Amino acid sequence: MMAERFSALQAVAGPVSRETFDGLVAFEGEFRKWSARINLTAPSTLPHLWERHILDSAQLIRIAPAARRWLDLGSGGGFPGAVIAILMKEHAPAQVDLVESNRKKAAFLQTSLASLKAPCMIHPQRIEDCYGQIPPPEVITARALAPLPVLFGLAEPWMKAGARALLHKGRDYRREIEESRDAWGFNLLEHGNEVGGDGVILEISDLRRL
């Protein structure tokens, strides 16, 4: 079972040490424990937590293998930000900033990631309150947070400084792209989801208001 999980992780994220794999397994265990007390994710997805959330998050590393400064907006239960932070342990020096305004979820992230000594900082604030506090990252991530036009408005201050965004989107992503084009210009690359399903990962760069 563990060997299969390790192989699946390497298939989507590239070479990963056994220590990093063990860290992700430990995070999964903490996630399940805390989920019994607070709502970290939809209960229906818990039986498939490794594939549905952890591997789905880990695949971003393959798209931006050289990035060392990441910013995760609306981190929720830690996907993809916590997974990226754990993966970054073997790529020091690295920094992952996770922004989550829900205090209980932020407490979970702080406790679980501190115990794993992940190179990250948790910001228990609204995204808009973090402008000027978090230095420009190389990559911005967001998963199940908001439609593209809203995401662009939230990410704009960092993207103007040169960051690119890797955004998980579902089957309606083309409609969101078209709705964004009235107000925003941007470069777009579409990456297939290596874990399966109808979703994609949108790589956005050179974001600008029209």
Curated annotation (Swiss-Prot):
Q: Which GO terms describe its cellular component?
A: cytosol
Show the GO MF annotations: rRNA (guanine-N7-)-methyltransferase activity
Gene3D superfamilies recorded for this chain?
Vaccinia Virus protein VP39
* Location in the cell: Cytoplasm
Which residues does UniProt assign to the signal peptide? none
Name residues in a coiled coil: none
Annotated transmembrane regions: none
A Pfam family this protein belongs to? GidB
As its record notes, the protein acts as a catalyst of: guanosine(527) in 16S rRNA + S-adenosyl-L-methionine = N(7)-methylguanosine(527) in 16S rRNA + S-adenosyl-L-homocysteine
Predominant location category: cytoplasm
Q: What keywords is this UniProt entry annotated with?
A: Cytoplasm, Methyltransferase, rRNA processing, S-adenosyl-L-methionine, Transferase
The record describes the protein's role as:
Specifically methylates the N7 position of guanine in position 527 of 16S rRNA.
Q: Which family does it belong to?
A: Belongs to the methyltransferase superfamily. RNA methyltransferase RsmG family.
Record protein name field: Ribosomal RNA small subunit methyltransferase G
